[in-house]
Amino acid sequence: MNMSSRIAYTLTTLFVSAPALAAPPTVFIPEGSANSVLMVQAETGKVLRRINDVEAVHGLAGAPGVPYLVAGSYSEIPRENVASLEMPSTVSADDHAAHHAPKAAPMGPPDAGISLLSILDAKSGDILRRIEVPGAVHHTAVSPDGRFAVATHPAGDGISVIDLATFGMTAFVPTGSMPNYAAFGTDPNLVYVSNTGNGTISEVDLSRGIVRRNFIAGDTPEHMAVSPETDRLFVADADAGQVLELSLSTGEKLRTFEIGGEIHGLGLSNDGATLFVAGRGEDKLASVALATREVRTAKLAPEPYHLTVIPGSDILYVSSRAEPVVWLIDTSSMQTRETVSVEGEGHQMVALP
């Protein structure tokens, strides 16, 4: 075997025997009033696909290794119009028929309209199923084991619980006034729900369909981030311009971080050492070093809104509430690397490896 043949053989062997390189993360950006979800390549912002026919999509959630994304609509449909909804092109006839099969007595407030959760394939983005829930959906969350999804209903003062094995709604759990955001820790059976209207966080047992505990959390708790390693829950007290650090074990408030102005999205760095905060009211992005309490800010305008940290990366995605743009931010310098143009406005973004 000559030298060229040996080199070619060696390279071929390496490529065949080496494990396949992991695909770069994908970011799913709900585009709100555009009725669509944009899929982009996380590192570059390159557009991969636009998923259409997801009406008034605001909430979107998934989890690593879970094959589904759950998208919530902020619009409602009169009950009498549900049967006439057009079948999405990617939904099978059997699934569509199951969706319109006779239902048991509706759960939730009796005067609630009907909203739809869309179940998306987490790889392709195809719409697989629609699920009826009682009232407009603000945010959604998916349990780490992929068993449950939840949707918050601000007008209904509770959450819907979905079994992702059967795509059935199993419970409506009253939590408090104007439930806003939902987040899981390490226990896939427990979800934490911020109730903006009464300043509490509800710990909900999803198997039992009950609230186990309520924590006091400022005046207007909205977005949250969980640090499972440290047993901490970070809560945006939006109107107060503060982030509260709570103990998940006791519900006790441990620290308060002053950001200033109205705040919105939260996200933890991949190493859990830094908390990022979207300062919507003062057009800024803030980072909090949790070990030292140091707060750094950088100008970001207009109106930074939702925020998500890209796994295994030094990039942070931040949407604008005022313009159709998402910024790709370097987590160290807090400067913009790239921008992604969106239709409508970017809401609860999901980044999956």
Per-region residue spans from a language model:
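Bacterial N-terminal signal peptides that target proteins for export
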Residues: 1-9
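Predominantly soluble domains enriched in secretory-pathway, periplasmic, or organellar proteins
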Residues: 19-353
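Bacterial N-terminal signal peptides
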Residues: 8-19
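Intrinsically disordered, low-complexity segments
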Residues: 2-3, 15, 263
